[in-house]
Curated annotation (Swiss-Prot):
One of its GO terms (biological process) is L-histidine biosynthetic process. Belongs to the HisA/HisF family. The keyword Cytoplasm applies. This is 1-(5-phosphoribosyl)-5-[(5-phosphoribosylamino)methylideneamino] imidazole-4-carboxamide isomerase.
Amino acid sequence: MYPEFEVVPAVDMQDGQVVQLVGGERGTEKTYGDPVEAAQRWVDAGARTLHLVDLDGAFEGERQNAAAIDAVLDAVGADVDVQLGGGIRTAEDAVSLLDRGLDRVILGTAAVETPEIVGEISDEHPGSVLVSLDAKDGEVVVSGWTEGTGLDPADAAGRYADLGAGGILFTDVDVEGQLDGVRTDPVRRLVDSVDIPVIASGGVATINDVLALRSAGAAAVVVGSALYEGQFTLDAAIDALGESSE
């Protein structure tokens, strides 16, 4: 998983279309067209991993965009790694997706409500579970970022690492989709708390934000709005990462 730092384009889906939300709030979405076309565009630009999110599933509690997800897997699943979150609530559902060809499942609400699910899935598909720790005001939130849990992200991360999680996906909800830049301190704190990869998400507006997250110790960064709004291109970010590591 993530042998070297990479930029992972987001393909967030709502009603079968690619959208981006501001601050995780329903009603703020901006639509960007067909998921397969978006996925293919990112693969052609050099993506090694795609980050799919079923937003309807995240809000409603069960996956709603199965047809679009299947279409993306059929189109590009053989070319890149694909990870999916949103509405995955049972081990059976997760395993069926992994058996279908998905590389990683992302668990948020399910992992908080039933932590042992992480171990159940990991026993059958080692390294395949990313636990999503989405933080608002320093607290892990679930159910489409609408419910607080009282959990501290760094404290929770250690527990999931012990249960066999392959990585932690950390979304800084307070800056998500706002194109105002990233906050590296929460990422550093998570990286220091676990020995598994931490994938950062939320707030990326420039290539310098990408480089800052790599310096903070993240294994990868998920980018959505900045790519869709043309703040920078994926191939330019990939080039900058290569140049800065030389």
